[in-house]
Amino acid sequence: IMIKDPDLDDFSTEEAAELFDNIKSDFHQLEDAIASDQFPNSNYKNYIDIQSLVKFLIVFDLTHNMEINHPKSTYMHKDETGKYFMGPIWDFDWAFGYEGNRIHFQSFNTPLFKLITPNSKGYYFFTRIMEDPEVKALYKEIWQKFSTESMEPLLEYVDFYSAHLTESQAKDYQVWS
């Protein structure tokens, strides 16, 4: 667990250690509920907002962002309800066929969830959640609404902004290629 906010450097060593332990313990309760033999009837939905989770998964599906399998760059936050919410989303360097050979988009059936390493914690976390029939149903519902109402505006948005990024993209390739 990495903590962005609150900044633990703003606390004494003892306070920071206690805060870190509390956050870690809280997150372990979510993980334990997901790993429970009682899943999906465990209380895991008391810890995480399913709607934000499903929208997060749809974004990763659309972009085929393999980062989800070992999420070192996955943000979650809590609101006043005490539940975890996914986002904001970022770190898409493992998306859109990130490999030089673009293998992820050469095969339509390459799974998003894939054991990249034995420690692919995201793989275990997210595949387990996708076993919940309620999550699957919500995924289908949100996807159907998105694909019929929002896909076309998204594609128009991408086309519009890609024209503005052409020069920047060329400079980026010069620096990073």
Kindly give the residue locations of the regions a language model identified.
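Middle-to-C-terminal accessory/interaction subdomains
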Residues: 1-70, 74-177
